[in-house]
Amino acid sequence: MNKEKTIIFSMPNTHVLAQEICDELKMKLHSVNKTIFADGEVLLSSKETVRSKDVFIVASTSHPANNNIMDLLIFVDSLKRASAKTINVILSYYGYARQDRKAEGRQPIAAKLLADLLQVAGISRIVVVDLHNPSIQGFFNIPVDDIKAQYILSKEFTIKDEKFTIVSPDHGGTIRARIMAEIISNDVKIAIIDKRRVSTNKTEVLGVIGDINNENAVIVDDIIDTGGTIVNAAEVLKKNGAKKISIVASHGIFSKGFDIFEDADVIDEVIVTNSIDNYELAKKYKKLKIVSLAPFLSKVIRSIMDSKSVSDIYAKYLESK
């Protein structure tokens, strides 16, 4: 990896993750110069020369999504006009990923629109953590690496000397649950929460598919938003005989705060990655634990710069378990 020809930037909302990545790579983190004008418009640029350099931007289009998206687009445009050789975005959270299809007539496909905007701005490659729907990769005409956070999160359970069942919170997450179960051990069973959606951000839990009686349960999801559905699922698992219940997710949005989890007696812990900066919440709440993506993402950056396979990182991880 030619560090002299590589430069890493952090968008304002991902500074902690970006610094951790740079610490892993033993590289300097460069900040983005941002100006907010009186009318609300923004200007973002680099103080560093980027001409003929491979640029990596650590970003997240989490809340406030629209502001963070616009910041990223403007900064990418500035780098393109400054003659950067390549512009690679490490997008820890892909906003609008849940708007990946027309659920009803006259609705937009915002996930596709965002993909178009990122490409027009000038991005060469995107590395994204756990897309809500892997098919979103098909919205791009540039290389996309969809990093599976299960490999990072599973380490929290491979080191524990206890038996547990991996639980998918719905039928759509069965593959995600199966992948995590197989990463941990071939002996780990899975169960599925049977539920139906009754309105936006609201679902009704019908029951559990699989035996959870007298088992520790680990509910695995990609996104935790309001938290109501997850808490309901935990309550159903407890009624069906589950012992300790852990919640594991790639992205902790927590749009209604964390009290709903901290106050839920049926939930023992909530583990999320730092794809979204929740460190202040973790200082306040005992049940919240954050796992850093930095060790894994730093290896991804190194593989890209050395023209090596990103898939090999997964293989080496499994070999080192």
UniProtKB/Swiss-Prot annotation:
InterPro entries the UniProt entry points to: PRib_PP_synth_CS, Pribosyltran_N, PRibTrfase_dom, PRTase-like, Rib-P_diPkinase, Rib-P_diPkinase_bac
EC number(s) on file: 2.7.6.1
Pfam entry (one): Pribosyltran_N
Superkingdom, taxonomy of origin: Bacteria
Keywords associated with the record: ATP-binding, Cytoplasm, Kinase, Magnesium, Metal-binding, Nucleotide biosynthesis, Nucleotide-binding, Transferase
Gene Ontology BP term (one): ribonucleoside monophosphate biosynthetic process
Name of the top EC class for this enzyme: transferase
GO cellular component: cytoplasm; ribose phosphate diphosphokinase complex
UniProt cofactor note: Binds 2 Mg(2+) ions per subunit.
Active site: 195
Required cofactor names: Mg(2+)
UniProt record similarity statement: Belongs to the ribose-phosphate pyrophosphokinase family. Class I subfamily.
Function text: Involved in the biosynthesis of the central metabolite phospho-alpha-D-ribosyl-1-pyrophosphate (PRPP) via the transfer of pyrophosphoryl group from ATP to 1-hydroxyl of ribose-5-phosphate (Rib-5-P).
NCBIfam families to which the protein is assigned, alphabetical: PRK01259.1, ribP_PPkin
Name listed for the protein in its UniProt record: Ribose-phosphate pyrophosphokinase
